A protein has these predicted regions:
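Alpha-helical interface subdomain recognition
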Residues: 1-90, 107-112, 119-123, 139, ...
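Short glycine/proline-enriched turns and hinge-like loops at secondary-structure junctions
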Residues: 71-72, 139-141, 165-170, 183-186, ...
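Short Gly/Pro-enriched turn/cap motifs at secondary-structure boundaries
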Residues: 93-95, 120, 135-138, 162-165, ...
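Helix-loop "lid/cap" segments that line or gate small-molecule binding pockets
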Residues: 98-107
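A short, Trp-centered hydrophobic/proline-enriched beta-strand micro-motif
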Residues: 123-131
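Conserved hydrophobic/aromatic beta-strand scaffold that supports enzyme active sites
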Residues: 128, 142-146, 153, 171-175, ...
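Flexible, small-/acidic-enriched active-site or ligand-binding loops
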Residues: 142, 195-226
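A short core secondary-structure module
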Residues: 157-201
């Protein structure tokens, strides 16, 4: 029984492990060296983007028929995890490309898919997601951005807030009210291009973490777009937005895993080298207990995240629950693990000369975006009570 090597349950296929190794190699050489600089300057890590693009890791989820690598949901999560291990800001390149394009994959016309997905797959463009507004965060259905039909066009007016990679991305999935009397059933989704007249951007937000990924407001001032840029049928936008988040919360869980893994790896190396009272800090039982808890939480989060990724790929009925659970658990674990990593480094961990304080700051956002963890618990409870 112990010698049975073909038992593959709870073991990643070789091709997924190969993807991990390939991403890790690229990130070690061409992404990690830019992580501190991206954090210090707050500038988009173009060198990291170029490296990921060259290796086809910038938008791995896009199907082969649209020019993409055709990675499944688990492989995509592994890519994001490994990039986040090196640089959280850079991990938002593949993560947000998936977030922005998922509405097209779920509900877009074949023409829209061929027109836009191929540009993202080639690396010529990035795609962002515009759901939140200044007064519509967790309550996204209360948005006020309007889209009014005018012949063969729609005219959009409004403000979107907290838009990741805004100004860098060429394309945007924008959710807007087309029927003010229908609340969530009166919201529709559109593709807006950066070059459309009337599109502009606010100043970059001054953030705690993920500083290399710009976060800006997107202003829509009489933006006139062709009617064929609606994603799905009129009034189905909010449902598409929620279905999208079911899938992409898994990618935020993967991002949290990567940040936490990077912090644990660095802390392990540090405590083995650092000596106090005549021996390595790692030899103290109290430190070993901390490391054990960090590793345990991380592996539990990884198993849940990979299970959720499998459900995303299959389109399982319980994806809503598992996507929320993975995002919530992994991000809470990442915040705890990165905080403990800072503690293990002591005063050094509190300085910018060491990466763990950056990782702690980067981890915080994973508890907030794509639905706060309080909202995730509401989502999970509702799913449990439906059964």
């Amino acid at each position: 029984m112990a010698a049975e090597q073909s038992f593959d349950v709870y073991r990643l296929p070789e091709e997924h492990e190969a993807i991990r190794e390939a991403v890790r190699e690229v990130c070690a050489a061409k992404v990690a060296p830019h992580a501190a600089e991206a954090d210090e300057t707050g500038e988009f890590p173009k060198a990291s983007y170029d490296a990921l693009r060259a290796a086809d890791f910038h938008a791995p989820h896009i199907p082969v028929e649209y020019g993409g690598a055709g990675a499944d949901a688990l492989a995509t999560a592994i890519v994001i995890e490994e990039v986040a291990r090196a640089c959280a800001s850079s991990s938002l390149i593949p993560a947000v490309n998936k977030l922005g394009t998922m509405p097209l994959l779920l509900a877009g016309s074949e023409d829209l898919k061929r027109r836009y997905l191929s540009r993202v797959a080639s690396g010529d463009a990035m795609f962002s997601y515009c759901l939140s507004e200044p007064e519509a965060g967790s309550d996204a259905a209360s948005m006020t951005t309007r889209a009014v039909r005018d012949g063969d066009h729609w005219v959009l007016n409004g403000v979107k807030r907290w838009i990741t990679n805004a100004g860098v991305s060429e394309f945007y999935t924008v959710f807007a009210v087309t029927d003010p009397t229908a609340r969530s059933r009166g919201i529709s989704a559109f593709v807006v291009e950066k070059s459309d007249a009337g599109v502009s951007f606010g100043a970059p937000e001054k953030k705690l973490g993920i500083k290399g990924s710009p976060t800006r407001e997107v202003y829509l001032d009489n933006v006139r777009i062709p009617a064929d840029r609606m994603i799905g049928a009129e009034g189905t936008g909010f449902a598409t937005a929620m279905r999208t988040l079911d899938h992409t919360r898994v990618t935020i869980a993967a991002q949290a895993l990567g940040i936490a893994q990077g912090a644990l790896d660095y802390a392990k190396g540090y405590v083995q080298e650092r000596k106090q009272f005549g021996k390595a800090v790692a030899e103290f039982q109290g430190v070993q207990f901390m490391l054990a808890d960090m590793g345990m939480k991380l592996e539990a989060a990884r198993q849940l995240t990979y299970a959720a990724a499998g459900k995303s790929e299959r389109g399982d009925a319980d994806l809503t629950y598992f996507g929320a659970a993975a995002k919530c658990f992994a991000s809470d674990a990442a915040m705890e693990i990165t905080t403990d990593a800072v503690q293990l480094l002591g005063g050094y961990g509190y300085t910018r000369d060491y990466p763990v304080e950056r990782m702690m700051r980067d981890a915080k956002i994973t508890q907030i975006y794509e639905g706060t963890n309080q909202v995730q618990r509401i989502v999970m409870a509702r799913q449990l009570l439906k059964d």
